[in-house]
A protein has these predicted regions:
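Cytosolic juxtamembrane helix and N-cap/initiation of the first transmembrane helix
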Residues: 1-47, 162
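Residues within membrane-spanning alpha-helices of integral membrane proteins
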Residues: 19-33, 74, 78-81, 85, ...
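Hydrophobic transmembrane helix segments
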Residues: 29-74
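Transmembrane-helix signature of multi-pass solute transporters
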Residues: 35, 115-119, 142
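Hydrophobic, membrane-facing alpha-helical anchors
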Residues: 57-62, 79-90
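Juxtamembrane helix-break-helix junctions at the cytosolic face
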Residues: 85-104
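Hydrophobic alpha-helical transmembrane segments of integral membrane proteins
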Residues: 100-137
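Membrane-water interface at the C-terminal end of transmembrane alpha helices
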Residues: 139-162
């Protein structure tokens, strides 16, 4: 695990100077996403209660066993943490591959992320979740903007970047 984290740090935080800001922002997005997923696990009961109340299921008719299943389902978000770590590390590794297809992959991923978090901000949920989603959206928007800069585009095109 330490080798994995060391490689992620080396490939993202200390990437080529042309894409170093992108790597650092992607690592920041990964950390925020993981903290959000862990907080969701820790606060699974309050999140589940909020959603059940919002959907009208919290009128006392729901048996305790059904509520336990809902709480358990929210607790499974720990799987999200693992998938986020591996997903972001996969994308950070793409920074070292200088090809237009890698640039398109990173660009489409960041634009999709901005769109997804923009949608999630307007869905009913607890206020703290919207704050975290807004932070994630801003980070991914910054990644997308950086990927459009001439220096980063030249890097992925294989040209020399000063």
């Amino acid at each position: 695990m330490s080798e994995f984290l060391h490689r992620l740090y080396r490939q993202g935080w200390h990437a080529d100077p042309a894409v170093r800001p992108v790597g650092r922002l992607m690592i920041a997005a990964m950390v925020v996403s993981c903290l959000y997923a862990l907080a969701s696990v820790a606060l699974a009961k309050s999140l589940a209660d909020f959603q059940m109340h919002r959907q009208g299921m919290d009128d006392g008719s729901l048996p305790a066993s059904a509520k336990a299943i809902v709480y358990g389902a929210y607790s499974l978000r720990v799987i999200t943490v693992v998938s986020l770590i591996f997903g972001y590390s996969y994308l950070v590794q793409r920074l070292s591959r200088r090809s237009p297809s890698e640039h398109r992959l990173l660009l489409s991923w960041s634009i999709f992320g901005v769109a997804a978090y923009s949608y999630l901000i307007f869905t009913p949920n607890l206020p703290w979740t919207h704050v975290v989603q807004a932070i994630q959206m801003v980070i991914l928007l910054a990644v997308a903007v950086l990927l459009f800069t001439p220096r980063v585009r030249a890097y992925f095109a294989g040209a020399s970047v000063d």
